[in-house]
């Protein structure tokens, strides 16, 4: 690609300077980031609106297409990695996504903290006089577990995080601090999800839009 300089695959993908110093502004790297955002939004929004339009007449294909639409960020990151450095760039991106950066205790905490907080919230709700939700009967437990696994793996991490965390975060922190990068990603992430609040049948459509 004419707008990319010749560097090592990982450095080229992140836009790091030839001597390893992260430039504050690198036109080639910024174009790569802009391309990632455009591809992520174009894929997810385009398929999402198509899926929403066919929901009334073909609910199952619509649901499947909506799930595929959620892979926009990860697919966009892979595409930009290939355009930047070919197969070597794709391999460098995938290795970075799968890199074990913290101890196993942090993964255990991340896995257990959400259900623990939910239990605490239900306990507080009950202590204040609120009713507890009905538990599923035994026949529904396998379905609940399968749904949990589907959402845990496919509903976000595989489709989104390889893009937001695997590509966009390191690309931004190569030229700014992590706080500013996190703020930018938060805005992009929010805008990427925005159409779901206006599509009937999505979980977001049942939620208010916070201001």
Put a short name on every predicted segment:
Residues 163-173, 197-208:
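Membrane-interface interhelical connector segments
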Residues 44, 181-194:
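Small-polar-interrupted transmembrane alpha-helices in polytopic inner-membrane proteins
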């Amino acid at each position: 690609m004419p707008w990319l300089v010749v560097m090592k695959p990982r450095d080229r993908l992140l836009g790091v300077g030839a001597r390893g110093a992260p430039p504050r502004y690198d036109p080639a790297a910024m174009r790569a980031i802009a391309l990632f955002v455009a591809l992520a939004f174009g894929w997810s929004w385009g398929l999402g609106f198509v899926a929403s339009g066919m929901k009334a007449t073909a609910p199952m294909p619509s649901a499947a297409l909506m799930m595929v639409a959620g892979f926009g960020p990860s697919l966009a990151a892979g595409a930009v990695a290939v355009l930047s450095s070919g197969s070597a760039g794709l391999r460098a991106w995938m290795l970075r996504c799968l890199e074990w950066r913290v101890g196993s205790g942090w993964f255990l905490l991340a896995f257990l903290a959400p259900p623990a907080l939910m239990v605490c919230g239900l306990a507080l709700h009950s202590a204040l006089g609120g009713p507890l939700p009905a538990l599923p009967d035994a026949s529904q437990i396998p379905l609940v577990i399968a749904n949990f696994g589907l959402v845990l793996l496919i509903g976000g991490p595989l489709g989104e995080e390889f893009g937001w965390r695997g590509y966009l975060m390191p690309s931004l922190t190569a030229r700014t601090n992590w706080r500013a990068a996190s703020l930018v990603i938060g805005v992009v992430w929010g805008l990427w999800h925005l159409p779901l609040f206006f599509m009937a049948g999505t979980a977001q459509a049942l939620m208010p839009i916070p201001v």
